[in-house]
Amino acid sequence: DLPREDKEGKQGFSSLQTLAEECDILTFHVPLYKEGRYKTCHLADDAFFQSLKRKPVIINTSRGEIIETGALLNALDTGLVSDAIIDVWENEPAINLTLLDKVFLGTPHIAGYSADGKANATRMSLDTLCRYFNIQADYQIIPPAPSQPRITADTLSAAYLQMYDPRQDSNALKTHPELFEKLRGDYPLRREKEAYTIVNHPE
């Protein structure tokens, strides 16, 4: 995070090269800057993938242009990466179908599309408007309760898959990639883990 590193100092931050050499999972959460000192467009290009040391899993939930599609395809084909999970794509909604077919999970740009995420975004927008107009508003934004708020599972991973199984969204997109915009626009409301109670499976 170069902008934060410039403001806060180097402590607690790592270079992209260090991450490329040491990480088994690399996940991108950066804004898209197309030029300048903080350029992130095609941050993951051929040179980046060639620098990887541990064949990591690549995850992108930021912006599609952060990863150069051709470079990722080559990295998958040559074993520079173990696998990829992609939620954001270059040239949406006309996404690269070869990449969609190769990735472990591919979803239609739905990061932040949970009911909680939409509620938080609405709350932030209202707060900004209130500050701008110097008014106080009394409001509550309460997402709908999940249909099954009580989760029984042996492990946390099993519990989380009951809350949300990304394979369903991935299968839907891989089956009908031409419906990218519809799958995104008609995305059903789902709650995040704070809305659930997890209990151990009875012995």
Q: Where does each model-flagged region fall?
A:
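Short beta-strand "acidic-cap" motif of Rossmann-like dinucleotide-binding folds
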Residues: 1
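Rossmann-like dinucleotide-binding domain for NAD(H)/NADP(H)
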Residues: 55, 61-203
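Rossmann-like adenosine-cofactor binding region
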Residues: 4-97
